Swiss-Prot record:
PANTHER family: NAD KINASE. This is NAD kinase. It is found in: Cytoplasm. GO terms for biological process: NAD metabolic process; NADP biosynthetic process. The lineage of its organism: Bacteria, Pseudomonadati, Pseudomonadota, Gammaproteobacteria, Enterobacterales.
Amino acid sequence: MKNHFKCIGIVGHPRHPTALTTHEMLWRWLCSKGYEVLVEQQIAHELQLSNVKTGTLAEIGQQADLAVVVGGDGNMLGAARTLARYDINVIGINRGNLGFLTDLDPDNALQQLADVLEGHYIAEKRFLLEAQVCQQDCQKRISTAINEVVLHPGKVAHMIEFEVYIDEVFAFSQRSDGLIISTPTGSTAYSLSAGGPILTPSLDAITLVPMFPHTLSARPLVINGDSTIRLRFSHRCSDLEISCDSQIALPIQDGEDVLIRRCDYHLNLIHPKDYSYFNTLSTKLGWSKKLF
């Protein structure tokens, strides 16, 4: 049968011996099947692999057809922000807690992956957000997020006063502990815990979810995915930052705005053929069971 993928990258940042075991098992299995395999440098070092081709995440993105992320959702988010810049498919083997983005069961991963490698899979394009912290005539600080961009105090929790502009038109002002700007992918993450809506992954939409607002009128807002969001801050506000996927933080200085828009590139996320988004909601998040 024709191979749909020729070069496969193995990525992830293992924290437990069981995850490292999965990395090594996957490497040996792929090599035995005749695939060209690129192993992320840190993994190869920790496994003490010899005669193995290694690369950085960027090199894997440039050279491989498929990246297999071994770990939890945090590993997937960290790797996917880089891999999304390249024309590469990404799938995950769950070695974390929730595993909402890592579909493959570690106990049955090789059989599931064998089906995927033969072309039996579901492909999705997930968009990212780009966040810019900028001041007029100053250099921008930029990062991206798969799940969400969060405005919050830097160290000590306190109320923030800010205004929100959508496509440069004033939308609303708010006094709250922060704001979560989420993709459909991130709607089942931090946004959900703050009362935000669940968006199916194919929706072209962005959600704005207030964090502990100091008014009864503040509610989550869903806007078009093509929109550009600008956050402006009261001069009384200080020690603020935005975080991307709870992994990258950008401090906000006095006089700076934050711009958030959809990224120019997307993540090519693939799933096993029997994948169901609503089944994942049920099994991972306790979504309502069938009555009959």
